UniProtKB/Swiss-Prot annotation:
UniProt subcellular location: Cytoplasm
The protein, known as: Large ribosomal subunit protein eL21A
Organism: Schizosaccharomyces pombe (strain 972 / ATCC 24843) (Fission yeast)
One Pfam family recorded for the sequence: Ribosomal_L21e
Region (Disordered): 114-138
Misc: There are 2 genes for eL21 in S.pombe.
Family: Belongs to the eukaryotic ribosomal protein eL21 family.
KW Cell inner membrane (keyword) present: no
Gene Ontology terms for molecular function: structural constituent of ribosome
Keyword Ribosomal protein found: yes
Subunit structure: Component of the large ribosomal subunit (LSU). Mature yeast ribosomes consist of a small (40S) and a large (60S) subunit. The 40S small subunit contains 1 molecule of ribosomal RNA (18S rRNA) and at least 33 different proteins. The large 60S subunit contains 3 rRNA molecules (25S, 5.8S and 5S rRNA) and at least 46 different proteins.
GO terms under cellular component: cytosol; cytosolic large ribosomal subunit; preribosome
Family matches, as PANTHER family: 60S RIBOSOMAL PROTEIN L21 (PTHR20981)
Main location: cytoplasm
Length: 160
């Protein structure tokens, strides 16, 4: 039963550094550029206490709305009751990383553009929309060496 309700209460494993990731923070963390409109993930780095967001925001994805020298402002939507509340959180860059949530979409856009150019050069039309997977091919099941088995439920038996 916890008794303290501090800002970092019950974060023993949440703010833990990863395996073999202890020690000094990599320089690449500070060399990344963030622009307004970038989609970022908040991942708290337990080694840096300054600019640390509340534990609720750990693992959340938001949009950068403000950039300063050592921190970024992130816009996050928090579920409160039956509505979404817009939260603006100022976080140091050690606790933020670029999100990969749009990478699949951007790769698909590039692939579609290449397909469109190729089809235009050949004078053909191409289907660029994703299609659902078709149903499995029809086939016959042989019972020659594969006898059907009838399954019955096992009766419940109490052993007291």
């Amino acid at each position: 039963m916890p008794h303290s309700y501090g800002i970092r209460a019950r974060t023993r494993y949440t703010f833990q550094r990863g395996f073999r990731e202890h020690g000094q923070i990599r320089l690449s963390t500070y060399l990344k550029t963030y622009k307004v409109g970038d989609i970022v993930d908040i991942k708290v780095n337990g080694a840096v206490q300054k600019g640390m967001p509340h534990k609720y925001y750990h693992g959340k994805t938001g949009v950068v709305y403000n950039v300063t020298q050592s921190s970024v402002g992130v816009l996050i939507y928090k579920v409160v009751g039956n509505r979404y509340m817009e939260k603006r959180v100022n976080v140091r860059i050690e606790h933020v990383k670029h999100s990969k949530c749009r990478q699949d979409f951007l790769d698909r856009v590039k692939a579609n553009e290449a397909k469109r150019k190729e089809a235009k050069a050949q004078g053909k039309t191409v289907q660029l929309r994703r299609q659902p997977a078709p149903p499995a091919k029809a086939h016959f099941v042989s019972t020659e060496n594969n006898e059907p088995v009838t399954l019955h439920p096992v009766a419940y038996d109490t052993t007291i």
